[in-house]
A protein has these predicted regions:
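Extended alpha-helical targeting/anchoring segments
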Residues: 1-100, 104-106, 111-369
């Protein structure tokens, strides 16, 4: 288990961070990320799995899993909800007998959890999210991945209405997604495929160091017991209960295309994405669908996410945005060509790209964004 309590106390005294990760290592030869997710889903409906593979099908160094979040942040049409799960402690018998007025929480017994909810109306959820991120900001630790806990979830396409309110975007259709759903995971299970280790990670909060360190050590032991002896959930496969149909019929969609072409001709826009979601009633779980994706379409960004009311599974080749060491990067595929095998082929691909109006429009759109 590392770092030591003395090292954590030293880092806490510096005052740079309010949360410091602590880690316990296990050998990974008895586990797989898929098997681990079966255990975590049995313990909590709120969980995730993040994995990565490059184009040559070489798997990334880490697979990340999390469960049982301490907070969930959701927002729909400006109504922001923050649900917190706080741990409960009880005085030990000796403290009661001596008549102490206050409980020393470092010596208190952990007896359970309680939930609370805060609801507010906001013009932009980003302000509340930034405050929470700042409260739980953690240092990068030796022998740990850069992600050691934090927010995991999704922002829907409708989230744009908070950044561009003047567009007055309204949706007549009832959407399946909230504007955002983010969960705060203090515990992380990371598979280090390079070192063949499973890293169990939780956080020590510096505002009550003794109590928090003791509880973190207990939590790591609870995680160890869970993954070694926990029950596994059987995920029922997806079974369609109705035909898959587009949200817009062909005639309506063609009408939308013609209207978009008119706006482009008038100069109001130069590109538009006209989505047409496919819908069907189904039973079962998306987790087996995720397993098929990771086997048939290994990608740099593969994800499975589950909450009380939704499951999401996907595999994406693109880096939308990446923040590392204070540097923000984006690597979209639109408006690009693959590299050639020779300098001559590179030149030919470059010339073809520069003459492709569609690719140029996509490139300009991304630069504009």
């Amino acid at each position: 288990m590392y770092p030591t309590f003395d090292k954590i106390r030293e880092m806490a005294a510096a005052g740079d961070y309010k949360r410091i990760p602590i880690c316990k290592e296990l050998y990974a030869d008895s586990y797989t990320p898929v098997e681990m997710m079966r255990i975590l889903q049995k313990a909590s409906h709120h969980c995730y799995l993040l994995e990565s593979a490059s184009q040559n099908e070489v798997w990334g160094r880490y697979s990340f899993l999390g469960y049982d979040p301490s907070m969930e942040i959701t927002c729909t049409d400006g109504t922001l909800r923050i649900r917190r799960t706080d741990e409960l402690f009880e005085k030990k018998t000796d403290a009661l007998e001596t008549g102490k007025a206050e409980t020393n929480k470092a010596d208190a017994l952990h007896i359970g959890k309680k939930q609370s909810e805060e609801v507010m109306q906001v013009t932009h959820p980003g302000d509340a999210i930034r405050k929470i991120i700042q409260q739980y900001k953690s240092p990068v630790m030796d022998n740990m991945p850069t992600f050691t806990g934090g927010l995991v979830g999704y922002f829907s396409y409708d989230y744009i209405k908070y950044s561009e309110p003047k567009l007055d975007l309204t949706d007549e259709e009832q959407q399946d997604f909230r504007d955002l759903d983010l969960m705060l995971f203090n515990e992380v299970i990371a598979f280090d495929h390079y070192r063949q280790k499973v890293l169990l990670i939780t956080g020590v909060m510096t505002d009550n160091l003794d109590k928090s360190y003791k509880r973190a050590c207990e939590k790591l032991e609870e995680m160890t017991k869970l993954i070694k002896k926990g029950e596994k959930k059987e995920f029922p496969p997806i079974r369609l209960q109705s035909e898959i149909k587009p949200q817009f019929p062909k005639e309506k969609y063609c009408e939308m295309v013609e209207k978009a072409k008119h706006y482009i001709h008038e100069g109001d826009i130069f590109q538009v994405v006209l989505s047409n979601p496919m819908r069907a009633k189904a039973t079962g779980s998306l987790f087996d669908t995720y397993r098929v994706l990771r086997a048939t379409n290994p990608s740099p960004y593969m994800f499975y996410f589950s909450s009380d009311d939704i499951e999401i599974a996907g595999a994406s080749p693109e880096t939308l945005a990446k923040l590392e060491h204070g540097k923000l990067s984006t690597f979209p595929l639109a408006g690009t060509r693959p590299r050639g095998k020779t300098p001559q082929e590179d030149k030919a691909l470059e010339a073809d790209l520069l003459q492709d109006e569609k690719e140029l429009a996509e490139h300009n759109m991304l630069v504009d964004l």
